[in-house]
Amino acid sequence: MVLPNFKENLEKYAKLLVANGINVQPGHTLALSIDVEQRELAHLIVKEAYALGAHEVIVQWTDDVINREKFLHAPMERLDNVPEYKIAEMNYLLENKASRLGVRSSDPGALNGVDADKLSASAKAMGLSMKPMRIATQSNKVSWTVAAAAGLEWAKKVFPNAASDEEAVDLLWDQIFKTCRVYEEDPVKAWEDHAAILKSKADMLNKEQFSALHYTAPGTDLTLGLPKNHVWESAGAINAQGEGFLPNMPTEEVFTAPDFRRADGYVTSTKPLSYNGNIIEGIKVTFKDGQIVDITAEKGDQVMKDLVFENAGARALGECALVPDPSPISQSGITFFNTLFDENASNHLAIGAAYATSVVGGAEMSEEELEVAGLNRSDVHVDFMIGSNQMDIDGIREDGTRVPLFRNGDWAH
């Protein structure tokens, strides 16, 4: 199989990411994080960014093999410290209000078998050191977009029955192009129309200002409180300079932050989670008074326990997102082993930090003010998928009345 018009569609994709995703403006600095395997796409993105007037494009190359070797052989004292040059680079990007485009294509199991203590220590150190960047991103001080590219090992995981490596990669690119609307006659208008539909759902939820959400499904009975003056967001966002951008491509969600002090019940994951180079399956979480009191996983149990119990703020939730089961990604029937795609096929929750923009005026609040408002503060943010065609969700008003939001995995109205 050879994907028809691949080069033409890759160019369209690069333009969509730069012009509509990040929305590069004259004078911008752009930081591009991308795997060495995606050199062709990186070149197209860099060319397009400069064509739109970017003053500087900084490419931060990643490599699964090199990363794995580091974790296998580097001593702990190197892994639990972040080098000064990385912190200096972060500060440079912040000073220049750099937009951030992350193109994900990693092997979901790249770090299988690596010492969990090493992974946990490194993730914790990076989370603490990169906190200023995380805060800038989660409060939309700068534009940021997360997208994907078809990496070989990832493609083989998603399409294990493909006739060849080339076919697996082509099949994955085909899904990326479909879900990002690259095949549409006018991809820009297709995104505008899609964003308008999602915004209408967010507007309805913002008008209601529910006090809580109640989720029920096999293995799930969970009530999440919502903060006062919470904000449901959808496809588009606005940075501190008043410029629009798309945080995720693709996206099918509307999302907000729960009140981290008000979660009670239990929930079971419905899709695998790829986290820190490990694939985690069968996650079960129990909450009491907002805190995770028990968490298990059929596969990757220790990785999940380390995530929750070794990171500050990781015992509470920072995001709840609504995605109808009939979404195009869900209906593809494909498990992508990649959160960007799998979260857009399913209702999901996030362990850890909330986005500051999830309450009115949050982008201008201090960390302490956000916490008082009910938004969880943490150095991690990890989504896991809980939705299915058997999930019902009710919105609960202040007076206790219930409004059906989801029935059998889809919007009730």
Regions found by a protein language model. Name each.
Residues 15, 206-208, 276-279, 313, ...:
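Short solvent-exposed loop/turn micro-motifs enriched in small/polar/acidic residues
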Residues 1-264, 395, 401-403, 411-413:
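Active-site bordering "gate/hinge" segments
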Residues 112-115, 155-160, 236-237, 278-281, ...:
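A short secondary-structure junction signal
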Residues 225, 295-296, 406:
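Short linear motifs in exposed loops
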Residues 256-310:
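Long, well-ordered mid-to-C-terminal structural blocks that present hydrophobic/aromatic surfaces
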Residues 294-363:
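Dual-mode signal for accessory low-complexity, basic/Gly-rich regions
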Residues 368-413:
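Extended hydrophobic packing segments that form well-structured cores
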Residues 262-264, 280-282, 289-292, 315-319, ...:
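Active-site lining segments that contact anionic ligands and/or coordinate catalytic metals
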